[in-house]
Amino acid sequence: MPKIKTVRGAAKRFKKTASGGFKRKQSHLRHILTKKTTKRKRHLRHKSMVAKADNVLVVACLPYA
């Protein structure tokens, strides 16, 4: 049985937590930042969790996580 390949882009974007979930970075913080308020940018800096509905997709991309 061959090894399952890890999706490298997903490996760089998601980290598994001890409880089995995945943490991720918020989007919309790379460019076009002048029109966004300081409060909005500050809230986007915090990490977030992957939704339960999307957990299955992330697990498929990261078979050894």
Curated annotation (Swiss-Prot):
Q: Which GO terms describe its molecular function?
A: structural constituent of ribosome
Q: Which residues form the signal peptide?
A: none
Cellular component GO terms, alphabetical: cytosolic large ribosomal subunit
| Keyword set, alphabetical order | Ribonucleoprotein, Ribosomal protein
Family matches, as InterPro entries:
Ribosomal_bL35, Ribosomal_bL35-like, Ribosomal_bL35_CS, Ribosomal_bL35_sf
Give me the stretches of Basic residues compositional bias.
10-26
Annotated region (Disordered) at 1-26
Q: What does the sequence similarity comment in the record state about its family?
A: Belongs to the bacterial ribosomal protein bL35 family.
NCBIfam families, A to Z: rpmI_bact
Q: What's the name of the protein?
A: Large ribosomal subunit protein bL35
State the organism of origin. Actinobacillus succinogenes (strain ATCC 55618 / DSM 22257 / CCUG 43843 / 130Z)
